[in-house]
Amino acid sequence: MGSFSIGHWLIVLAIIVLLFGAKKIPELAKGLGKGIKTFKAEMEDTTPEKSEKVEHKEESATSQKIEETTKNA
């Protein structure tokens, strides 16, 4: 009762075609696909940089602890 049936989806599709026109829908889908592809590419580009920064910070923190320990000893 709460989910969409095939009839509901056909009505939604008909409304979309009426609003945008049959020629405009493929262009919109193509633009959406390019946007998603660009977003994923940017996410993959930034991921290695962040992990390198985290590793560098961890190494810095570890080296500082070692220096403090040797100074106190």
From Swiss-Prot:
Pfam families (UniProt xref): TatA_B_E (PF02416)
GO molecular function, a single term: protein transmembrane transporter activity
Residue intervals passing through the bilayer: 1-21
Subcellular location: Cell inner membrane
Cellular-component GO terms for this entry: TAT protein transport complex
Membrane topology type: Single-pass membrane protein
InterPro entries found in the cross-reference section: TatA/B/E (IPR003369), TatA/E (IPR006312)
PANTHER family documented for this protein: SEC-INDEPENDENT PROTEIN TRANSLOCASE PROTEIN TATA (PTHR42982:SF1)
HAMAP family: TatA_E (MF_00236)
Function of the molecule: Part of the twin-arginine translocation (Tat) system that transports large folded proteins containing a characteristic twin-arginine motif in their signal peptide across membranes. TatA could form the protein-conducting channel of the Tat system.
Similarity comment: Belongs to the TatA/E family.
Assembly mode: The Tat system comprises two distinct complexes: a TatABC complex, containing multiple copies of TatA, TatB and TatC subunits, and a separate TatA complex, containing only TatA subunits. Substrates initially bind to the TatABC complex, which probably triggers association of the separate TatA complex to form the active translocon.
Protein name: Sec-independent protein translocase protein TatA
Organism field: Campylobacter concisus (strain 13826)
